[in-house]
């Protein structure tokens, strides 16, 4: 990003708070992935009896895999057999009005989350010093993989330190890797109160409530890039595309500063990088064996 700026702009950039710089880069990386659909992940959801809506991760963009009929699908496993529910509209599910629990779904929809996510409140059970821009949130009383489900990109507040930031990754049931800003230490002490705001915006909505606990729904999806808000964070992207992303971050900064000519030049470089990746994706899709079976 620095290479794309002239000397006065670099000086101005150094007086910009650290989080804002990361936000420019993150926004550019997210836009790149949205345009190219180049990053994928898989999440496994676990059914709960009588439940119909299941939260998707905060980095969910859209579904990824289709069947041979060009229909989006997910994989449902009941412990012995696999089923392949198909994407439909929420309107169709609503009109179908299936209120009785079903053994397995035939259809599902992707919807906006129906209710505001509940806050996760807690107190740390160990200190987490800031190292290379990251700090560990430890809470032995929580279950961040299940009951107190947390995903990367959820927002975290250290009430004691008056700092806030993002969850970068979930290490295990009791540990989160975070990046904090605007506080006194931007780290966690033992016994610090914290609040996590879940950033989940989408849900997978089954055509009927689940009959049984413990079945799994495997959802392949196009995902946002990992949040890079620390010294050694990096995106799961080929390095050849990172220059274009940095140019878009420079565009966002220059646009704010009123340097529209330079901003437009860098935005053009970004769009050229998007076209290049799309061209490479198209060539790969034409290779032998690339068809859908």
PLM feature spans:
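Extended, beta-strand-rich, solvent-exposed assembly scaffolds of outer structural proteins
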Residues: 132-189
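Acidic (Asp/Glu) carboxylate-rich active-site/surface patches
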Residues: 127
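Glycine-enriched, solvent-exposed interface loops adjoining structured elements
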Residues: 1-123, 135, 150-152, 159, ...
């Amino acid at each position: 990003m620095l290479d794309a700026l002239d000397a006065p702009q670099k000086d101005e950039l150094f007086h910009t708070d650290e989080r804002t710089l990361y936000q420019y880069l993150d926004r550019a990386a997210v836009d790149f992935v949205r345009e190219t659909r180049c990053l994928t992940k898989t999440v496994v959801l676990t059914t709960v009896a009588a439940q119909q809506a299941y939260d998707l991760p905060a980095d969910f963009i859209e579904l990824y895999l289709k069947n041979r009929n060009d229909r989006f699908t997910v994989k449902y496993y009941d412990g012995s057999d696999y089923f392949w529910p198909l994407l439909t509209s929420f309107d169709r599910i609503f009109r179908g009005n299936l209120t009785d629990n079903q053994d397995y779904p035939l259809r599902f929809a992707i919807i906006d989350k129906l209710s505001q996510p509940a806050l996760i409140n807690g107190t740390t059970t160990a200190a987490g010093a800031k190292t290379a821009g990251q700090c560990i949130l430890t809470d032995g009383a929580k279950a961040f993989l299940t009951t107190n489900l947390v995903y990367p990109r959820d927002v975290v507040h250290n009430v004691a330190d008056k700092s806030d930031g993002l969850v970068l990754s979930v290490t295990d049931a009791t540990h989160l890797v975070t990046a904090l800003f605007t506080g006194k230490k931007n780290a966690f002490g033992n016994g610090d109160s914290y609040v996590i705001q879940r950033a989940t915006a989408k849900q997978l909505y089954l055509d009927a409530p689940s009959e049984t606990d413990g079945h799994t729904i495997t959802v392949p999806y196009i995902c946002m890039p990992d949040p890079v808000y620390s010294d050694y964070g990096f995106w799961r992207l080929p390095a050849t595309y990172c220059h274009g992303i940095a140019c878009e971050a420079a565009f966002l900064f220059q646009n704010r500063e009123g340097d529209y000519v330079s901003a437009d030049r860098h935005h053009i470089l970004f769009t050229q990088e998007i076209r290049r990746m799309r061209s490479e994706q198209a060539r790969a899709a034409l290779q032998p064996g690339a068809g859908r079976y």
